[in-house]
């Protein structure tokens, strides 16, 4: 596989799709293609779509020409997301689909914040998978992207609090995520979720177009 991928980089392929197939679950025990170092420092790609691919724990990323990145069926840590954003200064569109957020080991994510910080980003789509984080504590996903125009949050986002920082330029937002709860502590969980959702909506009052699905309510 690495030989084929190297062929695409040496021939300066701009749109690269590495999409492998299997169950939709981003199961960390399932074999996934480990992204080669030379691909992570490829300066010619403008669009990169990854499915069932995985990054090194603390990857070195240098995608200076990349404008569109789509990652699906993957487990991501805070450090991975930070390195991706720092190494992609021209990135305008980021889509994370069927993904899970986790720590460097199975129990390291509890209470950890994830920051999505980018001045170039204009479109952000987050679609979460029902993951093992339901057994952990609450964690905050902080979105700091002053030039963001479109935001979509959907899928399973158990014990996730979304926080918008700085003044955003949003013109359209779609909220379709579900915060499932176990029977134990259900009332307190829903109370926390209700307060978090209210806080998020107050940040979105100025948005010209806001769509909220029944999952959120």
Q: Where on the chain are the PLM-derived regions?
A:
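Short C-terminal beta-strands that terminate individual repeats in beta-propeller domains
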Residues: 113-117, 141-143, 164
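Residue-level marker for the onset of beta-strands and adjacent loop->beta junctions
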Residues: 44, 137-139, 158-160
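Extended repeat-based solenoid scaffolds, especially LRR ectodomains
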Residues: 144, 152-217
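Leucine-rich repeat
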Residues: 1-110, 115, 118, 128-137, ...
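Conserved hydrophobic beta-strand positions in leucine-rich repeat
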Residues: 14-19, 46-51, 67-72, 92-97, ...
